[in-house]
């Protein structure tokens, strides 16, 4: 996935901090910046940001990673958009947290648990 951002330096600081609990590795390229998270990858680059927000979800290996993501993302300048907890309206084991990034995108960490 690639996401346009208004300010790549500000977004880099946010995503490096927010995704640290996932063991993120940063990959730089001439066209943008990548974040490698095991078998997931995520790219940002400066560009026109769409009106409204995009919803991005990262699969966490456990609840502790979801909790750590929420703390790290808020510390990195994100805005709380849903504290860690169960979301049974999705399914019984859906444990997630939500934070708005510097461009207003809804960033989620989710652990699916047993369902």
Describe the function of each predicted region:
Residues 34-39, 47, 99-102:
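Active-site beta-strand termini and strand-to-loop segments that position acidic
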Residues 109:
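Short glycine-/small-residue motifs
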Residues 106:
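Glycine-rich acetyl-CoA-binding "A-motif" of GNAT/NAT acetyltransferases
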Residues 88-89, 112-115:
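A short acidic/small-residue loop/turn micro-motif
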Residues 7-9, 57-103:
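Vicinal oxygen chelate
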Residues 2-41:
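Core segments of cupin and vicinal oxygen chelate
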């Amino acid at each position: 996935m690639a996401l346009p951002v208004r300010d790549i330096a500000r977004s880099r600081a946010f995503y490096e901090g927010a995704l640290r609990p996932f063991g993120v590795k940063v990959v730089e390229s001439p066209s943008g910046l990548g974040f490698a998270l095991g078998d997931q990858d995520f790219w940002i680059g400066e560009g026109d940001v769409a009106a409204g927000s995009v919803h991005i979800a990262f699969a966490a290996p456990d609840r502790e990673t979801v909790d750590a993501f929420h703390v790290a993302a808020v510390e990195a300048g994100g805005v709380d958009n849903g504290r860690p907890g169960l979301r049974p309206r999705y399914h019984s084991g859906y444990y997630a947290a939500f934070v708005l990034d510097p461009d207003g995108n809804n960033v989620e960490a989710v652990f699916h648990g047993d369902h």
